Amino acid sequence: MKIAAIGGGVIGGGWIARFILAGHDVTVFDPHPEANRIVTEVMANAAEAWGRLYQSPLPKPGSINWASSIAEAVAGADYIQESVPERLDLKHRIIAEIEATASPQAIIASSTSGFKPSELREGSVHSERVIVAHPFNPVYLLPVVEVVGGGVAAQRASDILVSVGMKPVQIGREIDAHIGDRLLEAIWREALWLVKDGIATTQEIDDIIRYGFGLRWAQMGLFETYRIAGGEAGMRHFLAQFGPALKWPWTKLMDVPEFNDELIDLIAGQSDAQSGAYSIRELERIRDSNLIGIFHALKANDWGAGQTVKAMENRFYARNGKVQADYPLRLHEAHVNGGWVDYNGHMTEFRYLQVLGDATDALLIHIGLDADYRAAGHSAYTVETHIRHLAEVKAGARLTVETRLLGYDDKRLRLHHAILNEDGETVATGEHMLLHVDTKANRTVAMPPALMRALDHLNAQEEGPLPDHAGSGIRAVRLKETSA
């Protein structure tokens, strides 16, 4: 699938990064003289974040190609993401230029935060394929995207967005600013009043959000949070208790403070005092790191945004476990990013196990033990592991894992992995014993014939002697005798 991106700013750069990291080539057009630098910096942040977000092996990144015109960028593209400034006349001109060259079947998705599809489609030749796909920053991490416009194009776009790890929400009726920005604007408007009236500073408002209801919203949203607030009686009790307050009201509603230089200076000054010690890039990295921690917590509970991470990891595992004729198998590669390095300057201990575990997952998928197989109630559990650390691995290294089958029977599987660096040197080995289990009954069971046939096929390729360290335990170092 060929992707085209028109506009490479903060949002456009995030789109570009997400598609490239998911393995797609992207052709970009942006006449801004700093576009290449901006996208390169966003890509660096995104690559670092994905390396920490996903525990599965990542695909080989796609390539970025810079076009000298819109026509060159969209030629042959299947999906076109427009992320130019929020001016309707500009978007009309860009969409017209896209349609002049793009395939009639190509989806044209606008990142607009405010305009409706009906407005974007004015003057369009193939208006049915012009839709809204409005993301949230950082696009390479936050999965939700508001898809507005309906029809076949919206569904096709949603399928594509799911494949790159996003959570498309198709909005059935168009409205100015869609859903997310309408909610954000209400909070923003009220916050401006609180600052202008001297009731709270920017830091106090941010603290109340990030130490309070923001944490609830990140995992429960608005209505589910209030459902819990209603106690055992649920949402009806909450509405009965707090509904009358809507008639008071507490908020400024549609009143907006006069947006003048005085208000701008007040807010900008407080913001500088609050966060001026950090550069924007530093704040972005802090934000990304915190988001990754939240994603991991949600994934552990199979909840909310964590489900999108889990689903994407399953896609990566399935892609990685491709059929391979050569033996020993080379089913997994890894790139050591900066987040994998410890205080000694080399890859930290548990990352070796992660690489070995990813290689085991790739082998299991290779023989047919994939996500569908696990969902049906069977899996393989590792019950014993022996790792040997043979050489240091630095940040930036690219690793390949060679996998051999050392033994098997109807319930057990014994594997050997060798982690190789780019020079072919073995930097670590892992030997693992796995049991085939019925996850519903929580007991060991025999593997089905299809898995046994796949293992028989690997066994037929196993010709060399076992590694001389196979089956050995950790080297003995005895305690010194002490006098009584």
From Swiss-Prot:
Gene3D superfamilies documented for this protein: Hotdog Thioesterase (3.10.129.10), N-(1-d-carboxylethyl)-l-norvaline Dehydrogenase, domain 2 (1.10.1040.10), NAD(P)-binding Rossmann-like Domain (3.40.50.720)
Reactions this protein catalyses: carnitine + NAD(+) = 3-dehydrocarnitine + NADH + H(+); N,N,N-trimethylglycyl-CoA + H2O = glycine betaine + CoA + H(+)
Region span, L-carnitine dehydrogenase: 1-322
Pfam families given in the database record: 3HCDH, 3HCDH_N, 4HBT_2
Organism domain of life: Bacteria
Record's keyword terms, sorted: Cytoplasm, Hydrolase, Multifunctional enzyme, NAD, Oxidoreductase, Plasmid
Binding site for NAD(+): G7, G8, G9, V10, I11, G12
InterPro entries membership: 3-OHacyl-CoA_DH_NAD-bd, 3HC_DH_C, 6-PGluconate_DH-like_C_sf, 6PGD_dom2, HotDog_dom_sf, L-carnitine_dehydrogenase, NAD(P)-bd_dom_sf
Entry similarity comment: In the N-terminal section; belongs to the 3-hydroxyacyl-CoA dehydrogenase family. L-carnitine dehydrogenase subfamily.
Name the record gives this protein: L-carnitine dehydrogenase/betainyl-CoA thioesterase
